[in-house]
Amino acid sequence: MIDQDLIKSGSMHLKSMLASLSIDHNGLILIEDVFTDQIIEKLLKFCIAADDWEPQLTADNKTIVANRKKIAWRYDCIVEETHTILENVTPEICRLIKRDNLVLGGVNLWKDTEGYTIKPHTDNPVIQTSLQVYIQNLPTLSTIFDYDGNLVHTNPNTNAGYISDNLIGIPHWLPNAVPAEFNRYSLHAIWS
C-alpha cells in the first residue's frame, strides 16, 4: 500500500534540498541528503528482500551488462513512492538543469554485484537528465566524472549522488570493481 504521508514528507524534503542548490554549474550537480532517512531505510530493505531482479541491458538493448541487475517498476511499494516523489520535484530539476518541460521517464533500482565496474562513457543524450542516489555503497565505489578537465569524485556515502545534464556529455566511470560479498544498491532516475 502506498504511504501518502511518506510521499508528502519525502517530496517536501527533496524540494527543500534542491531549492538550496545553485543553478551556477556546467551540467554536474553533486547531491547529499536526497531522501529522508525513512525512505532510504525502506529502499534498502526492499533491495535486500527483492528476489526478482532483472538483467540490465545496454542502451541498444542487445547486451546484458555484467554484474548489474535492475528493478524497473513495482506498484504499491517504495519504488512507486520514490517515483511519485521525483515526479513531484520535476519542476525543481527543470530549474536546476535550466530546461523547461522535462518529463520523468522512470526510476530504476540497481544492484551491482561482485566484479561490476564501468569504463569511461557518456550517457545517451535521449535521456536529457539523470539522477543517481546511493542506497548502499562503499567508500571505494565513487563515480568519477571528467568535469572541465578535473576529476570529480561523487560522495560515495548512502543518500548521496549526483544530477547530470546528459546533453553536455560528461564522461564518467566507476574505476574500482564491486568487491566479493557486497551488493551496491542505488536509485537511478531519468528525465527527457
Question: What do the predicted segments below correspond to?
Answer:
Residues 2-97:
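Non-heme Fe(II)/2-oxoglutarate
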Residues 17, 105, 116-118, 150:
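Residue-level marker for the onset of beta-strands and adjacent loop->beta junctions
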Residues 38-41, 66, 103, 116-119, ...:
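Short catalytic/ligand-binding loop motif for oxyanion handling, primarily in non-cytosolic enzymes
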Residues 97-108:
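A short coil-to-beta-strand element that immediately follows conserved catalytic motifs
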Residues 108-110, 176-177:
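Short, solvent-exposed loop/turn elements at beta->coil junctions and helix N-caps
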Residues 109-124:
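Conserved short histidine dyad/triad with adjacent acidic residue
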Residues 125-127, 137-192:
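Catalytic core of Fe(II)/2-oxoglutarate
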Residues 130-132:
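Eukaryotic charged/polar low-complexity linker/IDR segments
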